[in-house]
Design a protein with these regions (language model features):
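Post-Walker A helix-loop "phosphate-sensing" segment adjacent to the P-loop in P-loop NTPases
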Residues: 131-143, 177-179
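Mid-core helix/loop region of P-loop NTP-binding domains shared across ATPases and GTPases
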Residues: 51-65, 148-150, 163-170, 178-236, ...
Length: 362
């Protein structure tokens, strides 16, 4: 926890270097410690657990067969395939972190990941954040005898109806900075900025940014707070939200300020064709190669690419949910393979079912 003490002159808290509890030990797949796993990823303990836990991996040649329960757990978690949006975001984050490394006066360049629901925005954000975390710990391992592990990445969710105080409190909660109802927003902000810089945060990921509405008084104050934080915290900020360019975030004076500092990355549906490539079919191939089913016929998913593209509208979130549910069904019913009938039987989210399920041909 971070200790705050009021100064005699101002009564404002001054923060001591962060006293962070030891993170959970890295664990193998599907054996996460219950207590460690209970921390949300919007706390640094939860983030450490997420970043250092080995992600699900497909079966490897020569590997002992997994049990039924292990395979069910594997398809429940499943792999993250590298989509074009993830590749673009990873490249841009790496470049902007270098670009802003020695920028001291004004806010560093930022990124905004935008797109429709179920397009993989949060997945891309978390994947790039984990990569940054692991790269930093490899580059700068903890000093011998150090009580505090590195905290290079912060992940914050914008709360519904965010005000400046509730938003800055979310920043404080991530590092366990104690706050009270009697503390002013300025006091919490001072503690957050000091502690984030002391802890060495280099990348701040802010999800659900579309929840901010600068057209309201409280929303405008929250947007101003974000601008203040980007200027005071020595880190690269990456935002993600639903169709951000069509929201009030990009309009008016405040919107113009954000648009002038941020590079936009569109995380949209995977196209069936892009020039000479087939991004959607390539993703299907990657997902199929990751399956752990005993009797699945290779090539089945790419063969049904037109049907799957229409069914999911090319959205990676809907697609991975469909494949995961179909795989779990195949294990449960003993067929151990995904067929067109298996895919047809899966009920997806309401939006996909209402707008994109192909009409049955008679």
């Amino acid at each position: 926890m971070v200790n705050t003490h009021p100064t005699p002159a101002t009564g404002h808290p001054t923060t001591q270097p962060p006293q962070l509890p030891e993170p959970p030990e890295p664990s193998g797949p599907y054996t996460a410690d219950t207590e460690a796993a209970s921390w949300p990823v919007t706390t640094w303990q939860g983030w450490q657990h997420f970043a250092t836990t080995e992600p699900p991996a497909p079966p490897q040649p020569g590997q002992a067969p997994r049990t039924r329960e292990e395979r069910l757990a594997y398809h429940s978690a499943f792999v993250t395939v590298r989509t074009p949006a993830i590749n673009t975001l990873a490249h841009q984050v790496r470049t902007l972190m270098i670009l802003g490394r020695h920028q001291q006066i004004t806010a560093r360049p930022s990124l905004i990941v935008t797109g429709p629901p179920a397009a993989g925005k949060t997945t891309a954000l978390l994947h790039v954040g984990r990569t940054c975390h692991l790269a930093h710990t490899l580059r700068t391992p903890p000093t011998q005898g150090s009580a505090h592990p590195a905290v290079p990445v912060a992940y914050v969710l914008v709360p519904p109806g965010a005000t400046a105080k509730t938003l800055t409190t979310e920043f404080a909660r991530y590092l366990g900075i104690p706050t009270t109802t009697r503390m002013t927003q300025a006091q919490i902000t001072d503690a957050v900025c000091h502690t984030y810089n002391t802890a060495g945060i280099q990348l701040v990921l802010i999800d659900e940014i579309h929840r901010l509405n600068p057209r309201t008084t409280t929303g405008a104050q929250a947007a101003d707070l974000l601008k203040d934080l980007t200027e005071r915290i020595r880190a690269t900020f990456v935002y993600a939200g639903i169709d951000v360019t069509t929201t009030p975030l990009f309009t008016g004076v405040r919107g113009a300020q954000l648009a002038a500092r941020a590079t936009l990355i569109h995380c949209g549906p995977l196209p069936a064709h892009h020039g000479q490539t087939r991004p959607f079919t390539d993703t299907l191939t990657d997902l199929e190669n990751a399956l752990d089913l005993h009797h699945h016929t290779p090539g089945t998913l790419p063969h049904h690419a037109p049907y799957l593209h229409q069914r999911t509208a090319g959205r990676i979130g809907s697609l991975t949910r469909l494949i995961r549910q179909a795989a779990i069904t195949a294990i449960h019913n003993g067929t151990e393979k995904i067929t067109k009938a298996t895919l047809d039987a899966v009920q997806l989210d309401h939006h996909a079912e209402t707008h994109h399920r192909p009409t049955t041909q008679h």
